[in-house]
Amino acid sequence: MSDFSHIHPDFQHIMALSAKDRLAFLDEPRWIGYDTARLIMDSLNALMDKPKRPRMPSLLIVGESNNGKTTIIRRFYDLCGKAYVNDDADAIKPVILAEAPPSADEKGLYISLLERFFAPYRASDSTAKLRYQVIHLFRACQVRLLVIDEFHSLLTGTATKQREVMNAIKLLCNELCIPIVGVGTREAVRVLHSDPQHASRFDVVSLPLWALNKDFQKLLASFEKALPLKKASRLHQPELASLFHAISGGNLGDLHRLLVECSKAAIESGEECI
């Protein structure tokens, strides 16, 4: 029997599958944990557990595009935010994960939130009516945390529109007494600076590009444990680590795509290692 000790025990059974199935396995979404991601997850959990009070703390997660921000919040949602029915037969949604409207628009924000409840609404309704519906559903479903992805999109629009949508977010935070988490590129910080009150409510956490160091080598070793290759590639070795860092630029999403494509080539060629 072959020794697949270079693969995580949870994935070793994949090695019994055909090459076609192993190629399909590479395209499946998979969580690769690392220190910064775990710290952000801990911060999200801490926010979710905060007792309700006026002026709830909030968080803005920023980083380069395709560098793992959305993956982290979706992982958090999968672990802590899925809807369920409680003992009283109430539909509970602990976390609402929504996407900011494509431009700064208060009505568009409410519509984006209503979509997450699969609730009927009329886009032609007044902004005030949509706001009321959002607040009612948040209370009825006992929402404890609101996450808004693509937060930097709120920069698109006039200064007046930006103020309106940020004031709407502040109102939701105050009215519902829940933390709000924004996720976006570094430009998202400019959204907060439109008003000192907004900036004071949000802590900012940065998800930087990876430096070429031991942490990057540890990341490569973690990736390798999820690659269904019959031979060890030893991706963490300095020469390979330097090469992958140079090609990916330290961008996590680019690194993941690169490793997947290299693994596919290794399977298809029969080399079975990178």
Q: Where do the PLM segments sit?
A:
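Walker A/P-loop nucleotide-binding motif
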Residues: R53-R75
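Conserved NTP-binding/hydrolysis module of P-loop NTPases
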Residues: V95-I96, P101-R122
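Central P-loop NTPase core of STAND/AAA+ ATPases
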Residues: F118-A140
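Conserved P-loop NTPase "ATPase switch" module shared by AAA+ and STAND
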Residues: L137-K161
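The catalytic "switch" region of P-loop NTPases
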Residues: L155, V165-L235, E239
